[in-house]
Design a protein with these regions (language model features):
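TM-loop-TM module centered on a large, flexible mid-protein loop between adjacent transmembrane helices
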Residues: 67-79, 227-286, 306
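A generic transmembrane alpha-helix motif of multi-pass inner-membrane proteins
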Residues: 333-406
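Hydrophobic transmembrane alpha-helices that form the core helical bundles
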Residues: 50-59, 65-116, 278-303
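Loop-to-transmembrane helix boundary motifs in multi-pass membrane proteins
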Residues: 5-6, 120-130, 222, 226-229, ...
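Hydrophobic alpha-helical segments of multi-pass membrane transport proteins
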Residues: 158-162, 283-295, 317-323, 342-367
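Helix-loop-helix junctions that connect adjacent transmembrane segments
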Residues: 116-128, 142, 149-262, 404
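Membrane-interface "cap" regions at the ends of multi-pass membrane proteins
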Residues: 1-27, 36, 49-53, 64, ...
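Transmembrane alpha-helical segments of multi-pass small-molecule transport proteins
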Residues: 8-17, 86-87, 111-140, 153-163, ...
Length: 406
């Protein structure tokens, strides 16, 4: 299995999906209760697996193995389709990659102090982080696959230790708590939605698996089941250990991962747990960075190929890494602003776009070997949910829905 490309692709999908923000997810669901948190997570997982499988369906019509999503968008919606697909992808991925580079540099800069040495400057750490990890992306999907397998083992070990300390402390009464306000379930949907955003690497995975529909489909199902299981178990541990009143206290005092870790550390009595959580967060940040940059690389490669621009690895490396690196070094605030729209961009690229592509594909190619179950009714239903998810942040901003952490 370790040499299996399908398994490797599943780990890349899982690694891209499980970001450093996963551990703070219980703060988003603090007022919802465990039961409704499970329902929301499973529902959004099913929705985004469905949209991922729509990409598998559409990729059956790709003219070349290395065609990107933007090329498919142009094929079915003309130049406007390519522009929308390319802009939404690159703005989202550049914003995320700049955030990951800044976060990775921050972690690396403080690493020497653990060995009694002087801290590294943040800018130096950012450059080292980008060059070292970026080299695996430049090699291609195979390089990311190899490193992701190693890092994933580290994440599993760290996560298992945290669960080992917390699960024995779970109280059933805490898990039975009802939402403080049922509107919290609606408000949390866009944040949890982005926690299943693996679609940015669809082109890379399809190419890596040689266009095999069955392998592609299996990689999505396995690769998304892993984060779903991790999210559910982590929610079980935190909601089971912390009561609703304790969650409210955290949100009032320190609504961050540190606040959550400190609260659970008090209950478990493990002072080592905070360090393990930091290790997990670091590894999750790295695997997410690798997946996101792979998406940038493939998106730019598809764009350059379309307009007959230089498409070698050197040019792609400069175009992929230079913009987020410059912003991470000199103007991180600009990407913080862009990140505030990440949910909207993710909803468009991960749901609205594949629905539109599948709709046109079914009209023009009615006899394709593989078609996602549900017919056009499922397409319309998923589209309506996508529109609602895109509107929710505005309803929160206008005061019609309560705000949640995240």
């Amino acid at each position: 299995m370790l040499q299996n490309k399908t398994f490797g692709s599943a780990l890349i999908i899982a690694g891209t999906t499980i970001g450093a923000g996963m551990l703070a997810m219980p703060l988003t669901s603090a007022g919802m209760g465990f039961g409704y948190t499970v329902l929301l997570l499973v529902g959004l997982w099913a929705l985004l697996v469905y949209s991922g499988l729509l990409f598998v369906e559409v990729y059956q019509t790709a003219d070349q193995l290395d065609d990107g999503v933007a090329t498919l968008a142009e094929k079915y919606f003309g130049v406007p389709g390519r522009i929308l697909a390319t802009l939404s992808l690159l703005i989202l991925l550049y914003a995320l990659s700049a955030a990951y580079i800044t976060g990775g540099g921050s972690l690396l800069s403080g690493l020497p102090t653990a060995f009694g040495m002087e801290a590294m400057s943040l800018k130096t750490a950012i450059i080292i982080f980008t060059v070292v990890l970026g080299s695996f992306v430049v090699v291609g999907t195979k390089g990311v696959d190899g490193l992701t397998r190693v890092l994933f083992i580290g994440k599993l070990v760290a996560f298992a230790f945290v669960l080992f300390m917390m699960l024995p402390k779970v109280a059933i009464d805490n898990l039975m708590a009802l939402p403080l306000d049922y509107a919290f379930v609606v408000s949390a949907a866009p944040i949890f939605f982005t926690s299943f955003g693996f679609h940015v690497i669809m082109a890379s995975v399809n190419s890596y698996l040689g266009g095999s529909v069955e392998k592609f489909r299996r990689a999505i199902l396995i690769g998304t089941a892993i984060p779903l299981a991790a999210y559910l178990v982590w929610q079980l541990a935190t909601h089971g250990v912390l009561s609703q009143s304790e969650f409210v206290r955290i949100l009032q005092a320190d609504p961050t991962l540190n606040g959550l870790v400190n609260a659970t550390r008090e209950i478990t009595g493990s002072h080592f747990m905070g360090e393990v959580v930091r290790v997990f967060s670091s590894l999750a940040l790295i695997t997410s960075f690798l997946g996101v940059m792979l998406g940038v690389f493939e998106g730019l490669g598809d764009l350059f190929k379309r307009y007959h621009l230089p498409n070698n690895r050197f040019v792609l490396t400069i175009a992929a890494f230079l913009p987020p690196l410059v912003f991470a070094l000199f103007y991180p605030e600009g990407f913080i602003t862009a990140l505030s729209y990440a949910g909207l961009l993710c909803a468009f690229y991960c749901l609205i776009l594949p629905i539109g592509l599948a709709w046109r594909t079914r009209i023009e190619n009615p006899t394709l070997p593989y078609r996602v179950a549900g017919g056009n009714f499922a397409l319309v239903f998923a589209l309506l949910i996508g529109v609602v998810i895109m509107v929710i942040p505005f309803l929160i901003q206008w005061g019609y829905l309560p705000a949640v952490a995240g």
